[in-house]
């Protein structure tokens, strides 16, 4: 008997939460967990991604959404400062984090607050997909 860990699916696929009970496959994480992030279900049709980007300025972050893929990139401006660390526990490396979005999930905005990048998402259900009442004659 095999046990499947579906937690990687919850972390990188936004808007598929209704389908997770049916899934049996696991998705691999290729970017090693940096930077750390949370995916929050705000309400039935709203999600929020919070990414820890301490040390990055707003100008060093780039967010793009194309088709069903959300890409967040962070690239530090080249600095020629030499530093001597006694201990370095804060990562200063560049990153690229990708999130596969479900159909009908749209990015509504982003803001940077106290080292956390918040990206707000919304599920927009087209009128054609909404249930409609059929009257009986």
Curated annotation (Swiss-Prot):
SUPFAM superfamilies: HSP20-like chaperones. InterPro entries: A-crystallin/Hsp20_dom, ACD_IbpA/B, HSP20-like_chaperone, HSP20_IbpA. GO terms for cellular component: cytoplasm. It is found in: Cytoplasm. It holds the Pfam family HSP20. The keyword Thylakoid does not apply. It comes from the Bacteria. Residues 28-137 form the sHSP domain. CDD domains: ACD_IbpA-B_like. Keywords: Chaperone, Cytoplasm, Stress response. GO terms for biological process: protein stabilization. Its main location: cytoplasm. Associates with aggregated proteins, together with IbpB, to stabilize and protect them from irreversible denaturation and extensive proteolysis during heat shock and oxidative stress. Aggregated proteins bound to the IbpAB complex are more efficiently refolded and reactivated by the ATP-dependent chaperone systems ClpB and DnaK/DnaJ/GrpE. Its activity is ATP-independent. HAMAP family: HSP20_IbpA. Belongs to the small heat shock protein (HSP20) family. Monomer. Forms homomultimers of about 100-150 subunits at optimal growth temperatures. Conformation changes to monomers at high temperatures or high ionic concentrations. NCBIfam families: PRK10743.1 (NF008013). This is Small heat shock protein IbpA. The lineage of its organism: Bacteria, Pseudomonadati, Pseudomonadota, Gammaproteobacteria, Enterobacterales. The gene is ibpA.
């Amino acid at each position: 008997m095999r046990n499947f860990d579906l937690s990687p699916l919850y972390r990188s696929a936004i808007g598929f939460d209704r389908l997770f009970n049916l899934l049996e496959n696991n998705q691999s994480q290729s970017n090693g967990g940096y930077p750390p992030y949370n995916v929050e279900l705000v309400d039935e049709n709203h999600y929020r991604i919070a990414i820890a980007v301490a040390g990055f300025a707003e100008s060093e972050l780039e967010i793009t959404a194309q088709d069903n893929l959300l890409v967040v990139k962070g690239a530090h401006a080249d600095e020629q400062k030499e530093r001597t660390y006694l201990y370095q526990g804060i990562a200063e490396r560049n990153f690229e984090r990708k999130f596969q979005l479900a159909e009908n999930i749209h990015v509504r905005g982003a803001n940077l607050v106290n080292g956390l990048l918040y990206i707000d998402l919304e599920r927009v259900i087209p009128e054609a997909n909404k249930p409609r009442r059929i009257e009986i004659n």
